[in-house]
Structure formats: C-alpha cells, structure tokens
From Swiss-Prot:
One of its GO terms (cellular component) is chloroplast stroma. It comes from the Eukaryota. Keywords: Carbon dioxide fixation, Chaperone, Chloroplast, Photosynthesis, Plastid, Transit peptide. GO terms for molecular function: protein folding chaperone. This is Chaperonin-like RbcX protein 2, chloroplastic. SUPFAM superfamilies: RbcX-like. Pfam families: RbcX. One of its GO terms (biological process) is ribulose bisphosphate carboxylase complex assembly. The lineage of its organism: Eukaryota, Viridiplantae, Streptophyta, Embryophyta, Tracheophyta. It is found in: Plastid, Chloroplast stroma. It comes from Arabidopsis thaliana (Mouse-ear cress). Chaperone involved in RuBisCO assembly process. InterPro entries: Chaperonin_RbcX_sf, Chaperonin_RcbX.
Amino acid sequence: MVSAWFVVGSPVMDSSSSPCLCLDAHTTGTIRRKKILGKARNLELGSSFTGSRIVFRLSPKRVSRIANRKSKKLLIVNEDVAGNYDDTFGDVQKQIVNYFTYKAVRTVLHQLYEMNPPQYTWFYNHIITNRPTDGKRFLRALGKESQELAERVMITRLHLYGKWIKKCDHGKIYQEISDENLALMRERLMETVIWPSDDTNSR
C-alpha cells in the first residue's frame, strides 16, 4: 500500500519498501516571488512532484497568518508509515533498560569514588574496555569479574527506574514532543517563504 499527502508543498511518501519523509522544499517544491505590486506580494508555489503551479497575490500579514495557521496542521499521523511499528515497541523498551544500566553504572562509579578509591579504579578501567551500551552484555561480563559489583549495578538500575516511573509524566512528554514538532515545522515553513525587500521598485 502506498499513501501520500502534502505538507506545505512537500510530499510525504509512505511505502512499505522504502518509507521516507521528504521535507526539503528545494528538491520537492519551490516558493518564490513573482511580482511586487505596491504592498501586496505575488507568491508562486510550484511543485516538481506534480508539475502544477499556483500564483497567489498575498500581503505580508496574510502570509504570516497562513504560516501560523498551517503550522498547527503540520503534524499528520498516518498509521501506515513504517508499517505496524506500534505493535510492540520492543526496541524502545530495550533502549530504556540499556539507559538505566548506563545510569546505574555512573551512580555506582560515583559512589565508589567517594567510598572505595581502589575499587573505583578497577571499575573505571573495566568500563573503558567494556562499554555499558548493551546492558545485558555488560552485566554478564562484569559478573564474571566481580559478582558483587554486577549485583550492585542491577539493584541500582532497578531502584533508579522505580524512582523515574513515579515521576514520569507521559502526558507532559507527549505535549513536549508535539510542541517541538510544531515549532520545528513552523521554523522550516518560515525559512521557505522568500520575503520581498521593501526597497524593491514596484510596478
């Protein structure tokens, strides 16, 4: 199944074989000045994808209002994008576990620095040769060298996760992502609008 829609003159294509998000206005479409008539501006919007072209005569205030209105509608959710990714999110869960393993390693390392400098030195050198990017692999290797430290890291990461899950506001995170998406798209939209200079001779 292939679905397509347009966001501010840029096509967003979805394909099961090669999903992509195309937001480059220079490659998918053009927005440029056609004429200047007094204070009104002519903006020509063309798309190389469709071969179509539309000319609008807009004032600067009108363009600004359009930009603000369009930016509120830029986030389009299509369930077909990248397949049925939301079935499991197993990779996200793995990354969360790996991150809390990394955070636990840093916490334990800091504790050892304060309380047991010799063990801190050993653990630091172990981390240099065994990066805690894969939590399970790291703890397996650490357990072969120091079961005590491995158990300490495991207990610490579980404790840290328990603290985080109580403070995590999923609604707030969702809103932050949504607001950031809109801000970035609004910023990109304003960059694609070519504003005529005020000192250009009008005809």
